[in-house]
Amino acid sequence: MNTFCHSTIAARIETAAAAIILFLTTLTSCGRSSSPEPLDQWNDGTSTLHTADPVIAEGRKLFNDKEYQNFRLTGEALTQPGSEAGLLFHTDGESGYEVIFRNGDIDGTRKSGSLASVRNLYRSLAKDGEWFDFEITVRGQNIIVCINGTEVVCYTEPGYPYRTEEHARQLLSQGSIALQGIHGEVSFRNLAIERLA
């Protein structure tokens, strides 16, 4: 038996296996520039709150001090009957986009996952009184919103989007993440954000 032939084949197999592992590692981290980190520092204008599980009451607004452009934000939310909150991104308090958190019966109000004034949803995939998962991904001109693992919004901002005067600054750029209470009280937990390339 020719041992040279077997050792050459073994070396080639080992090299090919290493290349495949490198390829798969690169593939699974494609577009990621960091691993998820807790979104746990908020400012309400008077004090700083350190929690990845904020509760947002009507009229309250919390800002994260960091700036984000391309990201994947995950977490869980809990609404009560009649409660509503918004999660804003690429915001300075006036600009950017807002994802709505509100559940309940079909009654003409925007439901969880709505990209406010752009893609409004009127049927909820989650229930009041039960925690539900959400994910918001922004990359380039694309916004994807998922509720309980189901994609509910896939929006690509055009070069010159139509906007009413009220929403003229609702554009992708970069900015902070904010939570705002609209009605009642909405709880969030396990908020985490991952910067994307």
Where are these regions (language model features)?
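Bacterial N-terminal signal peptides
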Residues: 16-26
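Intrinsically disordered, low-complexity serine/threonine-rich segments
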Residues: 7-10, 26, 32
